Amino acid sequence: MAVTFDISPEKEAGVLRLFHSQLFVTPPPLTRRDVDLSGKTAIVTGANGGLGLETAHQLLDLGCKVILAVRRVERGEAARQKLLEGRDAQATEIEVWPLDLSSYESVVGFAERAKTLSRLDIAILNAGLYKVNQTMTASTGYEESIHVNYLANALLITLLAPIFKNKKTGNTPGRIVLVSSDLAAWAKFKERKSNPILPTFKQKMTPKWDYLERYGTSKVLGQFFVTELAKRVSPDAVLVTTTNCGLCHGSELSREGQGHLIGYVFNVVSRLFGRSCSVGARVFVHAAANPVLGASVHGQYVEDAKLKPMSPLIYKPGDLQLGSKLWEETMDELSFAGAREIIDSLTK
């Protein structure tokens, strides 16, 4: 579906646009007058605090059953109790499922469990991290933010997509929402010039570790993946989109920076210019459930409750084959799970 934007990718990536959005734009909440999610089921990853917890809260307000996907079950249970406050416990459906994105095995196990659901309508993939220090994932050798933010989420999307198709009720497809970031638009992504690309993320970053650049790169990889996936998967099967809530104070993302200067700076800046998690989560819910956006979200990017351009790299003429190249490398990486065969079964 061709989409016309009210701003160019370059202007969308600009600092002035960012500050205008942060200071002067407040995405409206969705209410049951807009959409009633009664009887529907949603998965929210990274749901034990911050944006994930608030997203779960808003979905519950719309009548949805919510599955909290968390790395530590005890924290998920604490979040569940918090969400139940002021609600009828008998009428509120909240489940806690373990999910550790640092482990492909955990992702596969989570998806297997999702097959047992009677229906699945929404998945908001909010879990992610940034690393102040460079660390590698022991099981795969990839730098941790690339493994968690990109590869594990790409695996989860791939495994969930056929479940959405099989659990589809009526004529309205479900939606998978991958959370992105403003930093995706600023990433230089110099690794794209390598051949192949993904193995470079198993090497030490040179000349020095740049956590903001690497975090942004992990997010732009996700944008490429969603763009390529939407070319191959029919919107009648499942809608796949990406979204960004902007800078939010109280986000769990800041936990890695605690005890470091960057953590202090992040907290100060987010307090000065950031939205509350309550406002930020509204964007996720719009991407996942706004009926006005509908099928137009497929393969697109939702910001401030509207469709906006992704990173300029997605549209750069010299990089038009980059998405296809990344796709093939990612399918190779996830071949152990039959990724290509799964996507082929969903091909338009």
Curated annotation (Swiss-Prot):
Q: Which residues bind NADP(+)?
A: L51, R75, D100, N126, Y215, K219
| Signal peptide range | none
- What metabolic or biological pathway is this protein involved in? Secondary metabolite biosynthesis
> What SUPFAM superfamilies does the database record attribute to this sequence?
NAD(P)-binding Rossmann-fold domains
Would the keyword Cell membrane turn up in this protein's UniProt record?
A: no
Q: What class of enzyme is it?
A: oxidoreductase
Q: Which residues form the active site?
A: S180 (proton donor), Y215 (proton donor), K219 (lowers pka of active site tyr)
Q: Which domain of life is it from?
A: Eukaryota
The EC number(s) this enzyme carries: 1.1.1.-
State the phenotype upon gene disruption: Does not affect the production of flavoglaucin and congeners.
Name the keywords, alphabetized: NADP, Oxidoreductase
Q: Which GO terms describe its molecular function?
A: oxidoreductase activity
* Protein role: The PKS fogA releases the carboxylic acid (8E,10E,12E)-3,5,7-trihydroxytetradeca-8,10,12-trienoic acid as its product, as well as derivatives with one and two double bonds.
- Please state which protein family the record places this protein in: Belongs to the short-chain dehydrogenases/reductases (SDR) family.
Name this polypeptide is given: Short-chain dehydrogenase fogG
Query: Top-down, what is the taxonomic lineage of the species of origin?
Result: Eukaryota, Fungi, Dikarya, Ascomycota, Pezizomycotina
